[in-house]
Amino acid sequence: MIYRDFKGLKLSALGFGTMRLPVKNGVYSDIDEEKVAEMFSYAIAHGVNYFDTAWGYHEGNSEIAVGKALSAYPRDSFYLATKFPGYDLSNMGKVEEIFEAQLKKCGVGYFDFYLIHNVCEMNIDAYLNEEKYGTVTYLKKQRENGRIKYLGFSAHGDLGVMRRFLDAYGKDMEFCQLQINYLDWSFQNAKGKVALLDEWHIPVWVMELLRGGKLA
C-alpha cells in the first residue's frame, strides 16, 4: 500500500468508500453486514486504513454497518470519516442532533475526519447563514473538543460556489473531497477547483474516480 502524509498521519492512498456496499435481495437499505466485515478484513489486511461513510448512504444504514465492521479493530488502527448531510436542506439547524446520532451509529467517541457534505448551488446560502443555522460554528467547536480531529468539505457545485464557501470558511477547512476522473476533470471543472484549493493550500481527497463504476 502507498501511504500519504497528512499532518503527521500515515493515510492509505486508497480509501474505502461505503456508498455502495453489498446488499441483500437488491434492497439498498438492507446491507449484508457479513460481506462488509469480510471486505473490511481484506482491505485492512492489505493496508487500507481510511474508511468513508455518510449520514445518507444506504438510507442511513451505512454508518451503522461501518461502525459494526470497524468495532473488531483497535480504534487507533483506522481513520473514520463521515459527513453532515447539508445536501438535504431540512437538516439545516439539526447539526448537533445529527452529529450526536452519528457518533452513536458508528459506535465511536470521535471522528478522525468530518466533512460538510456536498457544498453546491442548492445549499450554499444556508451554509453561509451562520446566524440562523450555525453549522460550521458547531463543527468547529467539536473540533476544539476533540470529537472531530480534522474538518473539511466535499463539493459538487460550480467553481463560483466553492469560491464563496472558501471566502467564508477556507481558513477553517483542512481538506476537500472532490469528484475527479478523466470525465469530470473538464465536465465538472475539477481542474479549476483543484487550482482554487491549491491557492488556499487545502489538500484534495479524490472521490468518484470511476464514477461508481461507469468509467471502468
Ranges and model annotations:
Residues 1-78, 138, 144:
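N-terminal binding-site loop/beta-alpha segment at the start of enzyme catalytic domains
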Residues 7-10, 45, 67-77, 100-109, ...:
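Acidic (Asp/Glu)-rich catalytic clusters
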Residues 14-16, 43, 51, 66, ...:
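Conserved, mostly hydrophobic/aromatic
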Residues 76-88, 114-117:
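A short, structured active-site edge motif that brings together acidic residues
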